[in-house]
Amino acid sequence: DLALTGFDDDELARLTIEQTEGLTDPDDVPEPQAEAVSVLGDVWLLGRHRLVCGDSTTVEAVDACLAGVKPHLMVTDPPYGVNYDPGWRQRVGINNSERMGVVLNDDQADWREAWALFPGEVAYVWHGGMHAAVVAASLEACDFVIRAQIIWAKESLVMGRGHYHWQHEPCWYAVRKSGTGHWSGDRKQTTLWPIATRGEAAADDATVHSTQKPVECMRRPIENNSSPGQAVYEPFSG
C-alpha cells in the first residue's frame, strides 16, 4: 500500500510516472557539418564561457558577450600590427609547420576602441615589442596607467628575417587610474616569466594558429588578479 509511504497523491504521481522513450539515443552524437557555419551576432555558449562572432570594437558585440556581467579583469592577445606571414619559413625551407593560420587585422596595433568598451579596471595586453609605445598610448588614452611590462622569456628563439631573432614577447600590465588592481598573487612575482612551449607543439599544429601562446601566459594573470568564479574578458579570443 503506497499510502503507507507517507507521500501524498501528487508526490506519488511524480514518483511513479511511466518513463517514455525519447526520439533519439541520448548518447548519440550527431555528425558535425562539413563546414561549420557561424554568422555575425551568434553567441556560442561553451559551458560557463561565452564566445561571440562579432567585432569587439562595437557596443553590440561586447554587450552580447558580457550579457550584463562586468568583469574587472581583461587578459588579451590581440593582433600585434606586424603583418605576420606564417608561410615564409616553409617557402625558404626552414620548417614544415602546420601552423599556417593567418591573423586577421594584423596591420593594426592600436585597439583603443576595444579597451574603451571594457568595463573593468585591470588589463594584461600582450603585444609586439616594436609597437610597445603604440599599445601603451592606446591604453593610456582609455584612462589606464601602465604598472609593469611583463616579459615572456621563451626557451628558444623564433627564427626571423632580421639581424636579431626574437626570444621574448612583452605584455603590458595596466590598471585604471581609479582602480585598485584586485591583486590576488603573492609577493614573489617578477616581470620575467620563463614559460616553456615544449610539449605543446602538437596542440599548436592541431589548431593551426600561427602564433599560439602557452596556456600559462593567460593563466598566470588570471590567478594573480582574480578569484575563482569571477569573469575574465578577452576581446580577441586569444
Model-predicted regions and their roles:
Residues 1-238:
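Core catalytic lobe of class I
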